[in-house]
Protein backbone atom coordinates (compact mmCIF):
# COMPACT_ATOMS: atom_id res chain seq x y z
CA UNK A 1 0.00 0.00 0.00
CA UNK A 2 1.40 3.42 -0.90
CA UNK A 3 0.18 6.91 -0.22
CA UNK A 4 -1.55 8.49 -3.20
CA UNK A 5 -2.67 11.88 -1.92
CA UNK A 6 -2.91 13.15 1.61
CA UNK A 7 -4.47 16.39 0.45
CA UNK A 8 -7.84 14.80 -0.18
CA UNK A 9 -8.32 14.46 3.56
CA UNK A 10 -9.11 18.15 3.41
CA UNK A 11 -12.33 17.37 1.54
CA UNK A 12 -14.85 16.38 4.15
CA UNK A 13 -18.28 14.83 3.95
CA UNK A 14 -20.96 17.38 4.78
CA UNK A 15 -24.39 17.07 6.25
CA UNK A 16 -26.61 17.64 9.23
CA UNK A 17 -25.50 15.09 11.77
CA UNK A 18 -27.32 14.67 15.05
CA UNK A 19 -26.13 14.72 18.61
CA UNK A 20 -29.04 12.43 19.47
CA UNK A 21 -28.35 9.44 21.69
CA UNK A 22 -30.27 6.20 21.61
CA UNK A 23 -30.91 3.60 24.27
CA UNK A 24 -27.50 1.95 24.47
CA UNK A 25 -26.04 -1.27 23.18
CA UNK A 26 -26.34 -4.93 23.97
CA UNK A 27 -24.84 -7.88 22.13
CA UNK A 28 -28.13 -9.75 21.79
CA UNK A 29 -31.56 -8.84 20.45
CA UNK A 30 -32.42 -5.32 19.32
CA UNK A 31 -30.10 -2.48 20.23
CA UNK A 32 -29.84 1.11 19.04
CA UNK A 33 -27.22 3.32 17.47
CA UNK A 34 -26.47 6.77 18.85
CA UNK A 35 -28.99 8.09 16.32
CA UNK A 36 -31.77 5.82 17.67
CA UNK A 37 -31.59 3.49 14.67
CA UNK A 38 -32.60 -0.06 15.68
CA UNK A 39 -30.09 -2.81 15.00
CA UNK A 40 -30.96 -6.51 15.19
CA UNK A 41 -27.73 -7.99 16.54
CA UNK A 42 -28.74 -11.45 15.35
CA UNK A 43 -29.17 -10.34 11.74
CA UNK A 44 -26.86 -7.38 11.11
CA UNK A 45 -23.83 -8.26 9.00
CA UNK A 46 -22.52 -4.97 7.60
CA UNK A 47 -22.23 -1.30 8.48
CA UNK A 48 -23.69 -0.30 5.12
CA UNK A 49 -27.10 -1.80 5.88
CA UNK A 50 -27.62 0.49 8.90
CA UNK A 51 -28.87 4.04 8.39
CA UNK A 52 -26.34 6.80 9.01
CA UNK A 53 -26.85 9.07 12.01
CA UNK A 54 -24.14 11.50 10.94
CA UNK A 55 -23.31 12.16 7.27
CA UNK A 56 -23.80 9.76 4.43
CA UNK A 57 -20.66 8.00 3.18
CA UNK A 58 -20.04 7.66 -0.54
CA UNK A 59 -20.34 4.14 -1.91
CA UNK A 60 -17.81 2.52 -4.21
CA UNK A 61 -17.16 -0.74 -6.00
CA UNK A 62 -14.08 -2.89 -6.49
CA UNK A 63 -12.84 -4.60 -9.63
CA UNK A 64 -15.08 -7.57 -10.52
CA UNK A 65 -13.46 -10.79 -9.39
CA UNK A 66 -11.41 -9.05 -6.70
CA UNK A 67 -14.20 -8.23 -4.26
CA UNK A 68 -12.61 -10.40 -1.55
CA UNK A 69 -9.08 -9.10 -2.16
CA UNK A 70 -9.72 -6.05 0.01
CA UNK A 71 -9.20 -4.69 3.51
CA UNK A 72 -12.38 -5.00 5.57
CA UNK A 73 -13.24 -2.93 8.62
CA UNK A 74 -14.49 -5.61 11.03
CA UNK A 75 -16.30 -4.37 14.14
CA UNK A 76 -16.70 -6.81 17.01
CA UNK A 77 -19.96 -7.09 18.96
CA UNK A 78 -19.28 -7.80 22.63
CA UNK A 79 -20.89 -7.82 26.05
CA UNK A 80 -20.15 -4.83 28.23
CA UNK A 81 -20.51 -4.21 31.94
CA UNK A 82 -21.49 -1.38 34.27
CA UNK A 83 -22.26 2.00 32.70
CA UNK A 84 -20.71 3.58 35.80
CA UNK A 85 -17.25 2.85 34.43
CA UNK A 86 -18.00 3.89 30.85
CA UNK A 87 -20.68 4.98 28.39
CA UNK A 88 -23.78 2.85 27.71
CA UNK A 89 -22.93 2.43 24.04
CA UNK A 90 -20.26 -0.21 24.13
CA UNK A 91 -19.58 -1.95 20.83
CA UNK A 92 -22.07 0.11 18.79
CA UNK A 93 -20.45 3.50 19.51
CA UNK A 94 -19.90 5.53 16.30
CA UNK A 95 -21.54 2.78 14.21
CA UNK A 96 -21.99 2.69 11.25
CA UNK A 97 -20.45 6.00 10.15
CA UNK A 98 -16.94 5.58 11.56
CA UNK A 99 -16.51 2.21 9.84
CA UNK A 100 -17.64 3.45 6.44
CA UNK A 101 -15.85 6.80 6.57
CA UNK A 102 -12.51 5.26 7.50
CA UNK A 103 -12.91 2.58 4.83
CA UNK A 104 -13.64 5.28 2.25
CA UNK A 105 -10.66 7.38 3.30
CA UNK A 106 -8.30 4.39 3.17
CA UNK A 107 -9.14 3.62 -0.44
CA UNK A 108 -9.19 7.32 -1.29
CA UNK A 109 -5.71 8.29 -0.05
CA UNK A 110 -3.83 5.01 -0.49
CA UNK A 111 -3.60 2.20 -3.03
CA UNK A 112 -5.38 -0.11 -0.58
CA UNK A 113 -8.71 -1.43 -1.81
CA UNK A 114 -11.35 -1.61 0.90
CA UNK A 115 -14.68 -3.34 1.43
CA UNK A 116 -17.37 -0.68 0.90
CA UNK A 117 -19.74 -2.32 3.36
CA UNK A 118 -17.64 -3.31 6.38
CA UNK A 119 -18.51 -6.22 8.65
CA UNK A 120 -19.88 -6.59 12.16
CA UNK A 121 -19.50 -9.98 13.85
CA UNK A 122 -19.09 -11.69 17.20
CA UNK A 123 -15.87 -13.37 18.24
CA UNK A 124 -17.70 -16.70 18.09
CA UNK A 125 -18.54 -16.27 14.40
CA UNK A 126 -16.49 -18.75 12.30
CA UNK A 127 -15.98 -15.94 9.78
CA UNK A 128 -13.68 -14.22 12.28
CA UNK A 129 -10.69 -16.08 10.89
CA UNK A 130 -11.39 -14.76 7.38
CA UNK A 131 -10.27 -11.29 8.45
CA UNK A 132 -6.79 -10.25 9.63
CA UNK A 133 -7.91 -7.10 11.49
CA UNK A 134 -10.68 -6.48 14.01
CA UNK A 135 -11.79 -3.42 15.97
CA UNK A 136 -13.36 -2.98 19.40
CA UNK A 137 -14.62 0.44 20.46
CA UNK A 138 -15.16 1.57 24.08
CA UNK A 139 -13.63 -1.59 25.58
CA UNK A 140 -13.43 0.09 28.98
CA UNK A 141 -16.48 -1.96 29.98
CA UNK A 142 -15.63 -5.05 27.92
CA UNK A 143 -16.59 -8.39 29.49
CA UNK A 144 -15.42 -11.30 27.37
CA UNK A 145 -17.56 -14.40 27.65
CA UNK A 146 -15.78 -17.59 28.65
CA UNK A 147 -16.19 -19.11 25.21
CA UNK A 148 -14.75 -15.99 23.55
CA UNK A 149 -11.43 -16.04 25.42
CA UNK A 150 -9.82 -19.07 23.70
CA UNK A 151 -11.18 -17.99 20.32
CA UNK A 152 -9.63 -14.54 20.58
CA UNK A 153 -6.37 -16.10 21.80
CA UNK A 154 -6.27 -18.44 18.80
CA UNK A 155 -7.09 -15.59 16.44
CA UNK A 156 -4.28 -13.39 17.75
CA UNK A 157 -1.67 -16.14 17.91
CA UNK A 158 -2.49 -17.21 14.36
CA UNK A 159 -1.83 -13.86 12.73
CA UNK A 160 -4.87 -11.74 13.56
CA UNK A 161 -4.64 -8.28 15.11
CA UNK A 162 -7.03 -6.40 17.41
CA UNK A 163 -7.31 -2.61 17.72
CA UNK A 164 -9.07 -1.30 20.86
CA UNK A 165 -9.98 2.39 20.84
CA UNK A 166 -11.94 5.06 22.72
CA UNK A 167 -11.50 4.34 26.40
CA UNK A 168 -10.37 6.78 29.03
CA UNK A 169 -8.86 6.95 32.49
CA UNK A 170 -7.31 4.42 34.82
CA UNK A 171 -10.45 2.42 35.58
CA UNK A 172 -11.18 1.64 31.94
CA UNK A 173 -7.53 0.92 31.23
CA UNK A 174 -7.41 -1.55 34.12
CA UNK A 175 -10.42 -3.35 32.68
CA UNK A 176 -8.90 -3.67 29.20
CA UNK A 177 -5.60 -4.88 30.63
CA UNK A 178 -7.41 -7.42 32.81
CA UNK A 179 -9.51 -8.77 29.94
CA UNK A 180 -6.47 -9.11 27.70
CA UNK A 181 -4.65 -10.96 30.49
CA UNK A 182 -7.41 -13.55 30.30
CA UNK A 183 -6.65 -13.94 26.60
CA UNK A 184 -2.84 -13.72 26.68
CA UNK A 185 -1.81 -14.25 30.33
CA UNK A 186 1.86 -14.63 29.42
CA UNK A 187 2.05 -11.25 27.66
CA UNK A 188 1.61 -7.60 28.52
CA UNK A 189 1.10 -4.25 26.84
CA UNK A 190 4.15 -2.10 26.16
CA UNK A 191 4.10 1.62 25.46
CA UNK A 192 5.00 2.84 21.99
CA UNK A 193 6.76 6.19 21.82
CA UNK A 194 6.82 8.58 18.89
CA UNK A 195 10.03 7.08 17.51
CA UNK A 196 8.17 3.88 16.63
CA UNK A 197 7.87 3.28 12.89
CA UNK A 198 4.10 2.96 13.18
CA UNK A 199 3.93 6.76 13.49
CA UNK A 200 6.01 7.41 10.37
CA UNK A 201 5.23 4.66 7.85
CA UNK A 202 2.77 6.63 5.68
CA UNK A 203 2.16 10.00 7.31
CA UNK A 204 5.27 11.24 9.11
CA UNK A 205 3.70 12.24 12.41
CA UNK A 206 6.41 14.42 13.94
CA UNK A 207 4.35 15.67 16.87
CA UNK A 208 4.11 14.92 20.59
CA UNK A 209 1.79 12.01 21.37
CA UNK A 210 -0.87 14.28 22.85
CA UNK A 211 -1.08 16.18 19.55
CA UNK A 212 -2.62 12.99 18.14
CA UNK A 213 -5.31 12.91 20.84
CA UNK A 214 -8.90 13.11 19.58
CA UNK A 215 -11.80 13.60 22.03
CA UNK A 216 -15.50 13.24 21.30
CA UNK A 217 -16.84 15.94 19.03
CA UNK A 218 -18.48 18.01 21.75
CA UNK A 219 -15.28 18.19 23.75
CA UNK A 220 -13.29 18.80 20.58
CA UNK A 221 -15.43 21.78 19.58
CA UNK A 222 -15.18 23.24 23.09
CA UNK A 223 -11.41 22.79 23.07
CA UNK A 224 -11.21 25.09 20.04
CA UNK A 225 -13.30 27.87 21.61
CA UNK A 226 -11.16 30.54 23.32
CA UNK A 227 -14.26 31.92 25.03
CA UNK A 228 -14.71 28.67 26.98
CA UNK A 229 -12.59 29.10 30.13
CA UNK A 230 -12.97 25.49 31.20
CA UNK A 231 -12.38 23.53 28.00
CA UNK A 232 -10.25 25.70 25.70
CA UNK A 233 -7.21 23.62 24.81
CA UNK A 234 -8.52 20.56 26.65
CA UNK A 235 -8.40 17.71 24.14
CA UNK A 236 -9.04 15.00 26.70
CA UNK A 237 -12.32 13.86 28.24
CA UNK A 238 -11.95 14.71 31.95
CA UNK A 239 -15.07 13.09 33.36
CA UNK A 240 -14.25 9.37 33.26
CA UNK A 241 -13.73 7.13 36.33
CA UNK A 242 -10.27 7.41 37.80
CA UNK A 243 -10.22 11.19 37.67
CA UNK A 244 -9.22 13.76 35.05
CA UNK A 245 -5.49 13.37 35.69
CA UNK A 246 -5.68 9.79 34.41
CA UNK A 247 -7.39 10.94 31.20
CA UNK A 248 -4.97 13.68 30.12
CA UNK A 249 -2.22 11.79 28.38
CA UNK A 250 -2.75 9.68 25.28
CA UNK A 251 -1.06 6.30 25.17
CA UNK A 252 -0.53 3.89 22.30
CA UNK A 253 0.29 0.44 23.64
CA UNK A 254 0.84 -2.90 21.95
CA UNK A 255 1.10 -6.60 22.70
CA UNK A 256 3.75 -8.39 20.62
CA UNK A 257 4.16 -12.04 19.71
CA UNK A 258 7.50 -13.87 19.94
CA UNK A 259 8.52 -12.68 16.47
CA UNK A 260 7.89 -9.02 17.20
CA UNK A 261 4.54 -8.81 15.40
CA UNK A 262 1.86 -6.65 16.99
CA UNK A 263 -1.12 -8.80 17.98
CA UNK A 264 -3.11 -6.09 19.76
CA UNK A 265 -2.87 -2.32 19.80
CA UNK A 266 -4.62 0.07 22.18
CA UNK A 267 -5.21 3.79 21.70
CA UNK A 268 -5.98 4.85 25.27
CA UNK A 269 -7.27 8.31 26.18
CA UNK A 270 -8.24 8.89 22.57
CA UNK A 271 -11.48 8.68 20.59
CA UNK A 272 -10.38 8.05 17.01
CA UNK A 273 -13.82 6.70 16.20
CA UNK A 274 -15.45 10.10 16.68
CA UNK A 275 -12.81 11.62 14.42
CA UNK A 276 -13.91 9.23 11.67
CA UNK A 277 -17.63 9.25 12.43
CA UNK A 278 -18.21 12.98 12.89
CA UNK A 279 -15.99 14.35 10.14
CA UNK A 280 -18.83 16.10 8.28
CA UNK A 281 -20.55 17.80 11.18
CA UNK A 282 -18.26 20.68 12.15
CA UNK A 283 -15.51 22.41 10.16
CA UNK A 284 -13.30 23.10 13.16
CA UNK A 285 -13.52 19.56 14.49
CA UNK A 286 -12.83 18.13 11.06
CA UNK A 287 -9.74 20.19 10.35
CA UNK A 288 -8.18 19.87 13.80
CA UNK A 289 -9.11 16.32 14.76
CA UNK A 290 -10.28 14.27 11.76
CA UNK A 291 -7.84 15.64 9.20
CA UNK A 292 -4.76 16.15 11.41
CA UNK A 293 -5.12 13.35 13.92
CA UNK A 294 -7.66 10.53 13.63
CA UNK A 295 -7.28 9.76 9.92
CA UNK A 296 -3.48 10.00 9.61
CA UNK A 297 -3.05 7.85 12.72
CA UNK A 298 -5.53 5.25 11.46
CA UNK A 299 -3.92 5.07 8.02
CA UNK A 300 -0.52 4.55 9.65
CA UNK A 301 -1.75 1.95 12.12
CA UNK A 302 -3.60 -0.12 9.53
CA UNK A 303 -0.80 0.11 6.97
CA UNK A 304 1.77 -0.96 9.55
CA UNK A 305 -0.31 -3.81 10.94
CA UNK A 306 -1.12 -5.16 7.49
CA UNK A 307 2.50 -5.09 6.32
CA UNK A 308 4.41 -6.25 9.41
Q: Which functions belong to the PLM regions below?
A:
Residues 3-10:
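Sec/Tat signal peptide C-region and signal peptidase I cleavage site
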Residues 10-133, 137-140, 271-272, 277-308:
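Aromatic-Pro/Gly-enriched surface loop or interdomain linker
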Residues 14-22, 27, 54, 84-86, ...:
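An acidic, glycine-rich "communication" segment
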Residues 64-69, 126-130, 155-157, 183, ...:
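Extracellular/periplasmic catalytic domains that process cell-envelope and extracellular macromolecules
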Residues 73, 133-174:
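Short alpha-beta junction capping motif
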Residues 78-82, 128, 139-143, 162, ...:
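Solvent-exposed loop/turn segments at secondary-structure junctions
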Residues 98, 102, 148-151, 172-180, ...:
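Stable alpha-helical elements in mature extracytoplasmic
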Residues 112-122, 164-169, 187-195:
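Surface-exposed patches in mature extracellular/periplasmic domains of secreted proteins
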Amino acid sequence: MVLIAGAVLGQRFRGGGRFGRGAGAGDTGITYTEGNVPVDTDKVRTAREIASHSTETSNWTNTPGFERDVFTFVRIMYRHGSYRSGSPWGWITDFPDSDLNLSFRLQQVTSLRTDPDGKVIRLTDPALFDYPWIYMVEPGTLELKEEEVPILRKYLLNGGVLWVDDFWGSVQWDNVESEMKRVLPERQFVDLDMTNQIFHCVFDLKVPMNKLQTPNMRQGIRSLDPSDPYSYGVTWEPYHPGGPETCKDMHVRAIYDDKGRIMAIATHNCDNGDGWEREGEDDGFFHEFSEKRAYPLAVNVIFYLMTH
